[in-house]
Regions:
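Solvent-exposed edge beta-strands and adjacent loop segments
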Residues: 2-90, 136-150
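Mixed-charge, glycine-accented linear interaction segment located at domain edges/termini
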Residues: 132-174
């Protein structure tokens, strides 16, 4: 499902749409993670593929890099040198889901370097605010699970560089 299709479903079924005036709680279901799987056909973010079907989690973390230096009469000072966004995605395998089929393709599972870097967007469906950038897709599990249990998958979406500020309300036209 695309970003535009997902937002249309949320509007019609739950009366949820991005609003600059939204104030209140957000839950995990209020965030969209989408990637561009075909740069020739998906030229706008609204056409990118959403990570959702049979996905149990897409947890974001910010991993800071630091250096420690000791100075005379000051002591140790920690300097933040960078931050990398990581989105940990996992769920039950669903063949035919465009997101899963792409991230679990042979090209991505065994790819390296620029072959596994894709544009991504991560934003709130309540406010439209989030981030956009490029990320490496690192598949950490393609078929997990115990006997008689659903097959599972896991992938880390690791930002390359610093993502840009994103606002669906002002940056995207369907």
């Amino acid at each position: 499902m695309t970003v535009a299709e997902t937002l249309a479903v949320l509007k019609s079924e739950k009366d949820i749409e991005p609003s600059a005036d939204y104030a209140g709680e957000e839950n995990t279901d209020d965030f969209i993670l989408a990637i561009q799987t075909d740069k020739t056909k998906q030229t706008k973010e609204s056409a990118w593929i959403v990570c959702a079907d049979h996905v149990k989690e897409h947890s974001g973390s910010l991993n800071a890099s630091t250096t420690d230096e000791a100075f005379i009469r000051t002591g140790t000072v920690t300097t933040k040198t960078g931050t990398q966004r990581t989105l940990a995605v996992n769920g039950n395998r669903c063949v035919g889901d465009a997101f899963q089929d792409f991230v679990l393709s042979h090209k991505i599972k065994y790819g390296t370097g620029k072959d596994v870097i894709v544009p991504y967007v991560y934003f709130s469906v309540r406010t439209g605010k989030g981030e956009i950038g490029s990320a490496s897709l690192v598949v950490t599990g393609d078929v997990g699970g115990a006997a008689n249990a659903p097959a599972t998958f896991a992938v880390d979406v690791k930002a390359v560089g610093t993502p840009k500020d994103f606002n669906y309300l002002t940056d995207v036209t369907a």
